[in-house]
Amino acid sequence: MAYPMQLGFQDATSPIMEELLHFHDHTLMIVFLISSLVLYVISLMLTTKLTHTSTMDAQEVETIWTILPAIILILIALPSLRILYMMDEINNPSLTVKTMGHQWYWSYEYTDYEDLSFDSYMIPTSELKPGELRLLEVDNRVVLPMEMTIRMLVSSEDVLHSWAVPSLGLKTDAIPGRLNQTTLMSTRPGLYYGQCSEICGSNHSFMPIVLELVPLNYFEKWSASML
């Protein structure tokens, strides 16, 4: 999860988020090299008195500044498309969970079970226990098994919402009348926090998301206790 004064990403806890972090570093290095080159050329133009006022054309230079940007764009586009297809791919999910956005809370339904659903509201600041996080704790956490492919179906009952958990690299829009889907898989147990990431009204800031990823045997015990 995030911590005060954090400047970077949250720790990756899913294969997709790890790929996104690698892509970010890859793209950032390319941007840094381009920026350095541009600054170097500008500094030369400002400090040197040498000019080429008689030059009418320079086909070699024009060829270079046409081909080089094309190569750079390819180096950015290929890994980006690879991750995009990875995020859209859904292979035999072990569990399906449907989440609906409301003003201003989330409801969850485990569709593989006959009667396992609940609403998840933010715990008010006045009711927090010592050690709990302000504006991030909920009365009902979403308990899921770790190291298993889970399909999330996301929609909304009223206005636009967005179901987002940064540590897992998830952000899926909740649109009324439309059912979007995404997959998640955590490589380690823990609590993962998120929030609604689409402005949806006066209490938009009070729609936290808490996922509790646990080993399979703990999930089975929890699901049995909820039925």
From Swiss-Prot:
Q: Answer whether the UniProt record assigns the keyword 4Fe-4S to this protein.
A: no
Which residue ranges does the entry give as Mitochondrial matrix-facing topology? Answer: 46-59
A single GO cellular-component term on record = respiratory chain complex IV
Location in the cell:
Mitochondrion inner membrane
User: Which metal ions or organic cofactors does this protein require, according to UniProt?
Assistant: Cu cation
| UniProt: Cu cation A2 binding residues | 196, 198, 200, 204
* Example GO molecular function: copper ion binding
Question: Which GO BP terms apply?
Answer: ATP synthesis coupled electron transport
Binding residues for Mg(2+):
198
Question: From what superkingdom does this record's organism come?
Answer: Eukaryota
Q: Which UniProt keywords apply?
A: Copper, Electron transport, Magnesium, Membrane, Metal-binding, Mitochondrion, Mitochondrion inner membrane, Phosphoprotein, Respiratory chain, Translocase, Transmembrane, Transmembrane helix, Transport
Task: Give the cofactor note.
Answer: Binds a dinuclear copper A center per subunit.
- Catalysed reactions listed for this entry: 4 Fe(II)-[cytochrome c] + O2 + 8 H(+)(in) = 4 Fe(III)-[cytochrome c] + 2 H2O + 4 H(+)(out)
Q: Where does Cu cation A1 bind?
A: 161, 196, 200, 207
InterPro entries under this entry? CcO_II, CcO_II-like_C, CcO_II_C, Copper_CuA, Cupredoxin, Cyt_c_oxidase_su2, Cyt_c_oxidase_su2_TM_dom, Cyt_c_oxidase_su2_TM_sf
Q: How does it assemble?
A: Component of the cytochrome c oxidase (complex IV, CIV), a multisubunit enzyme composed of 14 subunits. The complex is composed of a catalytic core of 3 subunits MT-CO1, MT-CO2 and MT-CO3, encoded in the mitochondrial DNA, and 11 supernumerary subunits COX4I, COX5A, COX5B, COX6A, COX6B, COX6C, COX7A, COX7B, COX7C, COX8 and NDUFA4, which are encoded in the nuclear genome.
Family, as annotated: Belongs to the cytochrome c oxidase subunit 2 family.
- PANTHER family, per the entry: CYTOCHROME C OXIDASE SUBUNIT 2 (PTHR22888:SF9), CYTOCHROME C OXIDASE, SUBUNIT II (PTHR22888)
What does the function comment of this entry state? Component of the cytochrome c oxidase, the last enzyme in the mitochondrial electron transport chain which drives oxidative phosphorylation. The respiratory chain contains 3 multisubunit complexes succinate dehydrogenase (complex II, CII), ubiquinol-cytochrome c oxidoreductase (cytochrome b-c1 complex, complex III, CIII) and cytochrome c oxidase (complex IV, CIV), that cooperate to transfer electrons derived from NADH and succinate to molecular oxygen, creating an electrochemical gradient over the inner membrane that drives transmembrane transport and the ATP synthase.
The protein's name: Cytochrome c oxidase subunit 2
- Name its species: Rusa unicolor (Sambar)
Which classification does the entry list for the species?
A: Eukaryota, Metazoa, Chordata, Craniata, Vertebrata
Q: Give me the gene this protein comes from.
A: MT-CO2
